[in-house]
A protein has these predicted regions:
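A short, flexible loop at the N-terminus of ABC-type nucleotide-binding domains that lies
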Residues: 1-3, 12-26
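The feature captures the beta-strand-to-loop junction immediately N-terminal to the Walker
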Residues: 40-42
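Helix-to-loop junction immediately C-terminal to a conserved catalytic motif
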Residues: 55
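Conserved ABC transporter NBD signature motif
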Residues: 63-75, 115
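Short coil-to-helix segment of the ABC ATPase nucleotide-binding domain corresponding to the Q-loop/switch region
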Residues: 92-100
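Conserved ABC ATPase "signature" region
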Residues: 103, 110-128, 180
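Conserved signature/switch motifs of ABC ATPase nucleotide-binding domains
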Residues: 131-134, 152
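Hydrophobic anchor residue at the start of the ABC signature
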Residues: 146
Length: 260
């Protein structure tokens, strides 16, 4: 799988009264194959802007976005996007939503059903495959959103606060599911969140962005997700003194930028 990179990227918007607003400044970040990278930072620091650059929804004002060394000039099937708002089609079933992308891509019926059936099992929705979207809970809808992104077999998943709207119990279960999906599919992941605890739990690498203009100020490497895969409970991991110590370090880095 290919590395997704931002190199010396600036994003400048036109603000009120003709004034320019710099959302990101001199940002360089490479997501290597198999990594789970999580971005944190204060509101307005440019996390979502960076994700939009990677997705091809937004061009940089300067610098370059590349995938496997080739310029990213727009959205593409090699990058799957999952939003906080699941953006599902309410008139379709779970299966219909998940099969939508492969159907649009022209995948033949037998292969489409086999691929999507496997993904439906992977996200734990086999019993609900023929349910309509409006019949599902928030957590189940997000499972459908993740499955729909995976159905196109992207090289990397780009996730914009996918668990932000969920209650605490559902969110923790979904964090565990995300780790299992990452492990089993071997996809790279770039996720943004406001939760430092969530970042530490999920990531192999955390990047901290400063307030606007957003710059990457710190990076932290972590591997608590491996303990989830080994069968340790979320509560045990999150109460570990090493986890708590890292949480304080990351939070201090976020707050240092916000207070500057």
């Amino acid at each position: 799988m290919s590395a997704l990179s931002a190199r010396d990227v600036d994003v400048v918007y036109s603000g009120k009264g003709g004034r320019s607003v710099t959302a990101l400044s001199n940002v360089s970040l490479t997501i290597e194959s198999g990594e789970f990278v999580v971005a944190v930072g204060a509101s307005g620091c440019g996390k979502t802007t960076l994700l939009k650059l990677f997705a091809g929804f937004l061009p940089p004002s300067s610098g370059a976005i590349t995938l496997g060394g080739k310029p990213v000039r727009g959205p593409g099937g090699e990058r799957g996007v999952v939003f906080q708002d699941d953006a599902l089609f309410p008139w379709l079933s779970v299966r219909g939503n998940i099969e939508f992308g492969p159907r649009l891509a022209g995948l033949d019926s037998a292969e489409r059903k086999q691929r999507c059936g496997r993904i439906i099992d992977l996200v734990g929705l086999a019993e609900f495959a023929d349910h309509r979207i409006w019949e599902l809970s928030g957590g189940m809808r997000q499972r459908v959103g993740m499955a729909r992104a995976l159905a196109n077999e992207p090289e990397i998943l780009l996730m914009d606060e996918p668990l932000g709207a969920l209650d605490a119990l559902t969110r923790e279960k979904m964090q565990e599911l995300l780790i299992r999906l990452w492990d089993r599919t071997r996809r790279s992941v770039f996720l943004i969140t406001h939760s430092v605890e969530e970042a530490i739990f999920l990531a192999t690498r955390i990047v901290v962005l400063s307030p606007r203009p957003g710059r990457i100020t710190r990076e932290f490497h972590t591997d608590f997700s491996r303990r989830v895969l080994a069968g340790e409970s979320s509560r045990s991991i999150k109460s570990d003194p090493a986890f708590i110590a890292l949480r304080e370090q990351v939070l201090a880095a976020v707050l240092k930028g916000a207070d500057a």
